[in-house]
Each structure stands twice: as structure tokens, then as C-alpha cells.
Amino acid sequence: MTHRKLEQHEIEQALNQLNTEASEGWAIEDEKLSKTFKFKDFQHAFGFMTMCALYAEKQDHHPEWFNVYNKVSIQLTSHDVSGISNKDFDLAKKMETFALSV
């Protein structure tokens, strides 16, 4: 699959699928795939961020994120294509898996 910016209808379809397969909460905000995760405490939030960081580094695809205590707010976009790509949805799915494991 070619890495490219997704068209609006492709984004909507992938977003619907993501929110069906994963927990609800993913949305498009400021042309980025966004969600805020809430964890039991800071330790669990940081554990989640660590798993995501290690995976993202291997994929060479890094999230924009912000952490306060037990909350992690995430925005995903593909800077190299100036928009949302399949890489963002793939990373979002992996983040859902990591969130369930902490």
C-alpha cells in the first residue's frame, strides 16, 4: 500500500471502523486523528506512553501528545504527506492495544 494522504471519505470510513473495533473516542480535530486516554493513575499513563514511544520509534511515525497525571491526549498526522494517512490509523489501533494492556 502506498503511503499517501487519505481523502476525506477514506478518513471517515477508517474513523468509523476504528471506533467500532476499538473503544470509542477517536475524532478528527484540527485535521488530526485525536483521542484522550484516561488511565488509573500516572504510572499506568506513563507505561502506556512508553509502549507507544518504543513502537512509534520503530515505525518512524511519532505522535503529538500531552500528558497530565492519568490522561494522555494524542494527535496523529503524517507530516510527510501533510495530512492523515493509513500510518495514523495503524498507530491508533496499536495504541488501543497498548491501552488495554496497562
Swiss-Prot record:
The cross-references to NCBIfam families, in alphabetical order and at most eight, read:
PRK00823.1-3
Query: What protein family does this chain belong to?
Result: Belongs to the pterin-4-alpha-carbinolamine dehydratase family.
Q: Which domain of life is it from?
A: Bacteria
Protein's name according to its UniProt entry: Putative pterin-4-alpha-carbinolamine dehydratase
Q: What EC number(s) are associated with this protein in UniProt?
A: 4.2.1.96
Pfam families, A to Z: Pterin_4a (PF01329)
InterPro entries in UniProt: PCD_sf, Pterin_deHydtase
Which GO biological-process labels does this protein carry?
tetrahydrobiopterin biosynthetic process
What Gene Ontology molecular-function terms does this entry list?
A: 4-alpha-hydroxytetrahydrobiopterin dehydratase activity
Q: Which reaction does it catalyse?
A: (4aS,6R)-4a-hydroxy-L-erythro-5,6,7,8-tetrahydrobiopterin = (6R)-L-erythro-6,7-dihydrobiopterin + H2O
- Keyword NAD in record: no
**PANTHER family for the chain:** PTERIN-4-ALPHA-CARBINOLAMINE DEHYDRATASE (PTHR12599:SF0)
Q: Which UniProt keywords apply?
A: Lyase
- Gene3D superfamilies membership: Transcriptional coactivator/pterin dehydratase
Looking at its record, which EC class is this enzyme?
lyase
Q: Which residues form a coiled coil?
A: none
